[in-house]
């Protein structure tokens, strides 16, 4: 395998309600107790950082695998079937008696949503689910994991360091809030770190973006990428700062956009070792995903991505530290 994605797997149900339930001032969705809320439409898809990125890597031409934990239910079958259709290796997936992860994504006003998340079998992932002798990959992509599952990630990263496997890491707000000490065993072996500004500040503190990138790189990562939703993305490799702003596109749903960008960026690094190209590939992937429901539906194949990048060219600025 070129890359093994490690992380969560879920079945997502997107539930869209009338915009009147959303208060843009308070940024809250109001649902009255005892009321019956009419739903405009429902859409089912698979999700989770592990499976989203595995499919993205496969579509971008890499030999990809998924390592995670599923239940023994219909949701697990749905996920495995889709992974096989997308040519993702699932031989390392383990099973639990706990139900497969499930999310309800409540959309109330265009791109605004609330996610109700049942972690389920994802939180059952443990070090004993890692079979080192079968993990032949050049890269590990690690999406966020919590509790005992994160302890398993620490073991995985130790294996990577001892076997010259490169690591890409995309932590969540939950992990970032734990601080640098909690993350140090992973961060010191990371090649590519991708996170958003809020997560970066939870780890480092309230600093400007370029300073965040410098401080994060001092913790171990070779390349640090900090995103800001539709705002400017900054990448830093220890010598050069790269910055770019995504194209404005019509947003349908933002779920999975972070996974799409991160996987596109990492795929770009694997293929070319060029940060500028990787940024453009990541943005192309994310810009397409947010134009459709579901975290995987609009993930691009490599040919589609290159065509999109030529048509919607993004300027990447460079500056030396």
Describe these PLM feature segments.
Residues 3-4, 13-17, 176, 210-321:
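Conserved phosphate-binding/catalytic region of the ribokinase-like
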Residues 54-63, 107-108, 268-272:
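Alpha-helix C-terminal capping segments
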Residues 64, 90, 167-168:
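Hydrophobic beta-strand scaffold residues
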